[in-house]
Amino acid sequence: MKRTYQPSNLVRKRRHGFRARMATKAGRKILNARRARGRKELSA
């Protein structure tokens, strides 16, 4: 059986990266929430 998680750095960056977050209103909201919490890393 094939596992569900097949790691790929390219797909990871495209889906969860900083620029992907900045591209949508909801994504920017996520970044602001993570900044407010004081997260060291904001995105993948």
Curated annotation (Swiss-Prot):
Biased composition (Basic residues): 26-38
Keyword Ribosomal protein: yes
InterPro entries in alphabetical order: Ribosomal_bL34, Ribosomal_bL34_CS
NCBIfam families: rpmH_bact
Lineage: Bacteria, Pseudomonadati, Pseudomonadota, Alphaproteobacteria, Rhodobacterales
Gene source species: Ruegeria pomeroyi (strain ATCC 700808 / DSM 15171 / DSS-3)
Protein name, entry field: Large ribosomal subunit protein bL34
Region spans: Disordered: 25-44
The keyword Repressor is assigned to this record: no
Pfam families per UniProt: Ribosomal_L34 (PF00468)
GO biological process: translation
One Gene Ontology MF term: structural constituent of ribosome
Family in the record: Belongs to the bacterial ribosomal protein bL34 family.
Gene3D superfamilies membership: 1.10.287.3980
Keyword annotations from UniProtKB, A to Z: Ribonucleoprotein, Ribosomal protein
Cellular component GO terms, alphabetical: ribonucleoprotein complex; ribosome
Gene coding for it: rpmH
